[in-house]
Amino acid sequence: RALQKAANCSLGARIHVEKRIPVGAGMGGGSSDAAGVLVGLNRLWETGLTRAELEDVGLTLGADVPFCIRGGLTRTRGIGEAMQELPCGQCFPLVVIQPCGGLSTRDVFAAYHAQAVSFRPDNDAAQAALADGDLRALSPALGNVLQPVSEQMRPAIADAIADLRNCGAAASLMTGSGSAVFGAFETEQSADAAFAALKKRYDRVFRCETCMESVIEQI
């Protein structure tokens, strides 16, 4: 309906969304679904909205939707609407684990705001490391201010991050508000080996890689 209103369009559609991103994982599954539907309907209905216009519509649905429409690597400010596109030296092999049940984003943020959290990641250093494709330099610059809060709610998150590092991940962190965590590896072979080992310990383990394409380019 948001797209119908923005494009002054009365057409409809029967939509089936096959979800592959785990629910309650902090990976933007719902936001990416919304982005894909907006882009698909814009093409199906031939409404002709630009990417920027689709991002504006997406922002009315969720803070992460504009990024999911744009894709690639961005440095994001505000609630998600101010995006600076960044160069990336390479795509990284990943192993993603959802070690426990999902977390409520609202509950995590409520607990975060109730605490005094002074830690901040070094975004400038992370940006430089990503531009160089240097995972070893990236690792100490990474941080997720929500991670300590989510680990208190689900201690298995910290265990999974440790398991990824023990399996050779050059960088490992919680995604979003949790409960999923990822490990970035320097080679496909090391990621494959970690994936094989971790499948024996966890039910929900995924082998993937970073992607520099947007939803618009994939559909």
Model-assigned labels for residue ranges:
Residues 13-26, 168-172:
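Short pre-catalytic strand/loop immediately N-terminal to key active-site residues, enriched for Gly-Thr
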